[in-house]
Amino acid sequence: DAENVNKTPMSISANLDTLTLRPGLDMRDAKLNAQTGISGLSLFTATGSADDGSPLSAAYDATQPGGATVNVESGNAGFITQALIGADFLEGGKLELTGKFTKDASPATFDIALTDVRMRNAPFLTQILSLASLRGLADTLGGEGVLFSRIDVPLKLANGRYVVTGAKAQGPALGLTTSGYMEGKSGAIEFNGVLVPSFGMNSALGGIPIIGDLVVGRDGEGVFSLTYAISGTLEKANVSVNPLSALAPGVIRRIFENPSDTRIPEAKLRAPDEPVPSELPPIPEESFE
């Protein structure tokens, strides 16, 4: 019967003109291999190209007992990030995403690496550069864009919260670190980190033993660097920069930072005898200057 057919293991291989990975993201000239088991899809690989002609591959593996892994590689990081999350401020570059989903209640974890990508008209970064009186960099960001040779983003996802801890962006003109979270439903955000202008030259002292550790502080930071914070929502956020932190060595600069809450919220379970509400409670309005 139909139920038994759905549980029958199958192997599929196909060459497809178009494979829709998700709405807005199609793979052209795709070579597809997939396997299903009694629990559903167990293995999936697809290689092809994106709409702009750049190479694109995706893989999913649920054959291991610990959970499932996912891998996405693209020859155009800007195109993929726009298709996946609607981010239109990245151009070009390469992207590699690896992730793991566990079978228990642990958060899903992802590591995202982008290389040789250009950032242009990023709203929050433009505000940070302006508040830091880095007008030249702000103008470049709004014009040809700022080049980052590498961006690394460690990401956790659970209960609707996207948590970033220790993300780094490095380029000849600018370096950044950031940690914080975004709530998927409400769009609430809270991030903070360090901004390093002239990153290549500014962080060179980090290679000096002992002295480098003292004045630079942490990996991804430089001698002259400013701390920043973003809080509010995606639509309306408060951006602040601490100019005094630019004068402090790396270790002392920790005093000026206000670490964001990067905890994963625990899911609240409903008691068995508690009735299911007919409607959600109103969300309190918050204002951010």
Predicted regions and their residues:
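Solvent-exposed beta-strand/coil patches in large extracellular/periplasmic or lumenal scaffold regions
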Residues: 1-196, 230-244, 251-289
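Surface-exposed, gly/pro-biased binding rims or lids
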Residues: 196-239
